[in-house]
From Swiss-Prot:
GO terms for cellular component: extracellular region; nematocyst. Has both toxic and EGF activity. Residues 2-29 form the EGF-like domain. This is Toxin Bcg III 15.67. One of its GO terms (molecular function) is toxin activity. It is found in: Secreted; Nematocyst. It comes from Bunodosoma cangicum. Disulfide bonds join C6-C21.
Length: 29
């Protein structure tokens, strides 16, 4: 699965180990 780059507003809750980002709904948003 692909994700967006871990930058800006994504970095605080989307960042995953590996350089891509996916939405982590468990964090609340």
């Amino acid at each position: 699965d692909q994700g967006t780059a871990c930058t800006g507003e994504h970095a605080h809750s989307f960042c995953l180990n590996g350089g891509t980002c996916r939405h982590i709904q468990q964090l609340g948003e």
